[in-house]
């Protein structure tokens, strides 16, 4: 029976959300946290985008060093040969790609304005997949953008063409959140059965159904006899009304009535890391976690009603489906109310040594070497426009050369 694999797209779909964004260091921490959590793959960036170059190379280097241990790092590009060539010119060690192209009649007509028809879409995709493998890619996913508004006949043709040239999986993109759990189940199952390859499910929340659709889509693919790869973002942050939330989707798999008995993850996930990554993403994006967010919202384990409070005190399972400890919650958050020394863009070496010492991190005794780390911290503060968290400071101290690459943005660098 097929399994469920998580491909988190926070560092692609999440960061392209209007009015939001992450620094390259913050994106790197997200990858590290996803790896710690046991997530299968991160769509970690745009290898053709010039300002992503240092970040992409640095994260691939972290994977090579074993800092990122098991998480696959996959780049997103358009399904055109020019993008494939540019991606591998800028990131020669890239091994995993997703190639995206519009498949619906609406988008083909609306975007290309008569310059392309559906057969051109298939031709562009197949040529791009072949080019990616020729450049050294190990896995290539093919994205059918606006799949939920594409006819099933065309989707099957598109998927079979992708399979014929060796694509690893077909991404079914409910780009506008148009599907519902009933329609996506039937479509996903049909694609799995008729195309005969793993299907990736990518859902948006425009109608409030990203989690339900992801769950139903996963069920459909597995019932159709294939592995399923489900896209998530941390805290559901994504374009317009967002994507399927990572933690909520995991809870739906693991905790909903009867689902996990038959439909299981293909990789071990450490749910106790959920609170850590959700809280960091909230701080990094500067978007507060909704008070009622499943698993990580402030009210998720809060009780005021007399009947509920009495019941949960007697036995938490009376009114809680799962324990807060399972998500890594429960620690007391300490907030300094007295004197505090901070590390910022204008910090000096004395104060910086004090800050790092409080985290049990010893800086080099050599003043010049210590100042090099301090300078990186200053630049990181400038880029983030807010104080760095402890893990960011520790990362910079531990990996100064990688940090330098993350912080180096050169608009006019040669390809």
Swiss-Prot record:
EC main group: transferase
EC number: 2.3.3.3
InterPro entries from the UniProt entry: Aldolase_TIM, LeuA/HCS_post-cat, PYR_CT
Cystine pairings recorded for this chain: none
Alphabetic keyword roster: Cobalt, Magnesium, Manganese, Transferase
Keyword Magnesium belongs to the record: yes
Chain ranges of the Pyruvate carboxyltransferase domain: 4-275
A Pfam family assignment: HMGL-like
Regulation of protein activity: Inhibited by citrate and under aerobic conditions.
Catalytic activity field: oxaloacetate + acetyl-CoA + H2O = citrate + CoA + H(+)
Presence of the UniProt keyword tRNA processing in the record: no
Cofactor names: Mn(2+)
UniProt GO molecular function: citrate (Re)-synthase activity
The protein's role, per its UniProt record: Catalyzes the condensation of the acetyl group of acetyl coenzyme A (acetyl-CoA) with oxaloacetate to form citrate.
Family, per entry: Belongs to the alpha-IPM synthase/homocitrate synthase family.
Protein name: Citrate (Re)-synthase
Organism: Dehalococcoides mccartyi (strain CBDB1)
């Amino acid at each position: 029976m097929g399994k469920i694999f998580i491909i988190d797209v926070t560092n692609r779909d999440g960061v392209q959300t209007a009015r939001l964004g992450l620094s390259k260091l913050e994106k790197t921490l997200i990858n590290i946290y996803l790896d710690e959590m046991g997530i299968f793959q991160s769509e970690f960036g745009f290898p053709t985008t010039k300002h992503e170059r240092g970040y992409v190379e640095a994260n691939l280097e972290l994977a090579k060093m074993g800092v990122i241990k098991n998480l696959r790092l996959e780049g997103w590009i358009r399904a055109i040969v020019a993008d494939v060539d540019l991606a591998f010119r800028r990131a020669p060690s890239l091994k995993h790609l997703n190639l995206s192209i519009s498949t619906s009649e609406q988008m083909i007509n609306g975007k290309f304005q008569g310059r392309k028809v559906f057969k051109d879409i298939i031709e562009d995709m197949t040529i791009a997949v072949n080019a990616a493998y020729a450049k050294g890619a190990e896995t290539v996913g093919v994205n059918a953008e606006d799949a939920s508004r594409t006819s099933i006949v065309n989707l099957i043709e598109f998927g079979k063409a992708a399979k014929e040239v060796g694509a690893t999986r077909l991404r079914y993109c409910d780009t506008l959140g148009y599907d519902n759990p009933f329609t996506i189940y039937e479509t996903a199952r049909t694609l799995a059965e008729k195309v005969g390859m793993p299907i990736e499910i990518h859902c948006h929340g425009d109608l409030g159904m990203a989690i339900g659709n992801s769950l139903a889509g996963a069920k459909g693919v597995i019932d159709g006899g294939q592995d399923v790869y489900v896209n998530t973002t941390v805290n559901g942050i994504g374009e317009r009304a967002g994507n399927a939330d990572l933690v909520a989707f995991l809870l739906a798999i693991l905790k909903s009535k009867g689902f996990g008995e038959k439909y299981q993850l293909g990789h071990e996930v450490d749910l106790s890391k959920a609170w850590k990554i959700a809280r960091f993403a909230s701080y990094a994006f500067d978007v507060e976690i909704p008070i009622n967010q499943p698993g990580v919202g402030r009210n998720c384990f809060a009780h005021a009603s007399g009947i509920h409070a009495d019941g949960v005190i007697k036995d938490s399972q009376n009114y809680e489906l799962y324990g807060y400890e399972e998500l890594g919650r429960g620690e007391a958050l300490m907030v300094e109310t007295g004197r505090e020394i901070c590390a910022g863009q204008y910090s000096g070496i004395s104060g910086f040594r004090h800050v790092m010492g409080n985290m049990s991190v010893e800086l080099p005794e050599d003043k010049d070497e210590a100042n090099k780390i301090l300078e990186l911290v200053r630049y990181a503060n400038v880029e983030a426009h807010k104080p760095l968290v402890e893990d960011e400071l520790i990362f910079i101290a531990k990996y100064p050369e990688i940090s330098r690459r993350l912080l180096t943005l050169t608009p006019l660098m040669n390809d």
